[in-house]
Amino acid sequence: MKIAILGAAGRMGHILVDLAAKKGMDVVAKVDIAPGYDTTWGADTEGVVDFSYHTAVPANIEKAAAEGIPYVIGTTGLAPEEQSRVDACAARIPVVQSGNYSLGVNLMLELVNKAAKALGRGYDIEVVEMHHRHKKDAPSGTALMLAKSAAAGR
């Protein structure tokens, strides 16, 4: 499969580029605003994996939707207007979106939901996180997912 990786200069971008190569995928574009990276992807792209920055997601997914290219989003911190543009594109192309793709986190989401259900409304639930001071999205996508999972369990 020919994929474009957006946010290729970032932590996850580097991991994804390496993993794609190990899995025999053809990374046809390594897109990032950092010098030395592609600025967009070409017509031969069959899928886009986006770990860029929230403000870049809407224009990128709209380009993919116009070209009929499936889209995976790992970028977090989207504003409501940005998310609504993603949702509109998801009606036209396959879109997979998560704030965290880790198996452990997704199991934890399920456990938090069940714990909230078991504890009931007599207990307060609080999500507390700690991260480096340069984190771009705070609260993190994972913290928001945990809070939503707890709320849904009520």
Q: What does each model-identified segment do?
A:
Residues I61-E62, A66-E67, T75-V96, N106-A115:
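Rossmann-fold NAD(P)-binding glycine/threonine-rich loop
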Residues T40, S84, M108, D137-G141:
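Short, well-ordered secondary-structure micro-motifs
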Residues I33-G36, T76-A79, N100-Y101:
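Short, acidic/turn-prone active-site loops that include or flank metal/cofactor-
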